Amino acid sequence: MESSLYKKTSGKARRALRVRKALKGCSLKPRLSVVKTNKHVYVQLIDDVEGKTLAFISTLAKVAKTSGLTRKNQDNAKALGIKIAELGKGLQVDRVVFDRGAHKYHGVVAMVADGAREGGLQF
């Protein structure tokens, strides 16, 4: 008999793999990955060819803390999207592949995407 926690975590991992198997990011068009927990949001630009993170921001980062973006909510998620777009522009990145992970495209995840678009990134 499977525990409900095992079913929940394995289902989440399956959903994330299903989304990521169709996505590949390179240095010209990196993957914009969004991970959310109960308290925080993490956003990163990833080059899958080299296996490197090009840029990273979260609600735990010093830049976010000085801006007052310390909570997981939709307003802060949009601001994080704008900040990651600024970091991407500094790396001459203007096109990305959006990776929502195992999460639905609504709420915090959608606001990160909207903020990144508003900041100048193209999906």
UniProtKB/Swiss-Prot annotation:
Pfam families named in the record: Ribosomal_L18p
SUPFAM superfamilies in alphabetical order: Translational machinery components
CDD domains: Ribosomal_L18_L5e
Stated role: This is one of the proteins that bind and probably mediate the attachment of the 5S RNA into the large ribosomal subunit, where it forms part of the central protuberance.
Subunit structure, as described in the record: Part of the 50S ribosomal subunit; part of the 5S rRNA/L5/L18/L25 subcomplex. Contacts the 5S and 23S rRNAs.
HAMAP family: Ribosomal_uL18_B (MF_01337_B)
Protein family per UniProt: Belongs to the universal ribosomal protein uL18 family.
Protein name: Large ribosomal subunit protein uL18
Gene name, Swiss-Prot/TrEMBL: rplR
